[in-house]
Amino acid sequence: MYSDLQQPGSFSRKIVRYLRNNKTHSLHKPVRKHFKRRRIITHYPGQIIQMDLIDLQKFSGSNSGNRWILVVLDSFSKKLWMRALKRKEGVETADAIRSIFHDMDYPVQSVIFDEGKEFLNSSVNMLFAQFNIHSYHIRTKIKAGAVERVNKTIKNIIWKLFTETGKHRWIDSLNDIQDNYNNTYHRTIKMTPNQVTRENRKKVFKNMFPEIDDRINCRLQKGDNVRVALNKETFDKSYKVNWSEDIFTIEKVFQRLNVCWYRLKDQSGNIYPKGKYFYQLNKV
């Protein structure tokens, strides 16, 4: 490895090859957690909506017993609907979602949410079946990003309201907050959420995804052998093994919107349908 010190490029490439082939280094290599992931691609209002809850339990005494805000976001138009909840039980959550569906100007095709019991219950499932809606719940630690960002925006507005009024009452302002959000210019769609319709959806799509046809060079290729990052809890020791003992082979490479992801197969030829990103793989 050290025989060609006059050629720095050659020297660095040899180090990379050595480290890739060194099992100890390969297993303990740090895992990068924050990186660019695939975006949700939608083509019209109602195609995909996201749901989440804002936890305001500690202010329930000032808000007539209301403890939560149900947040529903249309991924295409960025339009927002909110409902106050006293309990996050199945029946109350389903009733709130139903009232939002009735307020919408278009049918909903798919819903995305996390694994909270407020959404994973028979009452909500029956509601989705009634409206012929496909539902998907997120099993990873990466939540539905768009609605998470909206939650932060809404909480920021509510906390400013607390400061301005000197009180912790938000329930009376919920509709005004919703209307203000939906009439505010959104830089992604280059208009307000209330201005988005099915008639101008092509313009909105072009504003959202101008780079949809761009091509990039993916850093891993079909046939490369890799280890897979282990799912570790927040407080797991960083010096423990970070990568799988088993070695997988990249079976297919995908890319869209300047993001690459990879489908893997194990040494027995079994294909794993769920894709992995570059930073979740460690080439060996």
PLM features: what roles do these ranges have?
Residues 8-156, 187-284:
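Retroviral integrase
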Residues 1-6:
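DNA-recognition alpha helix
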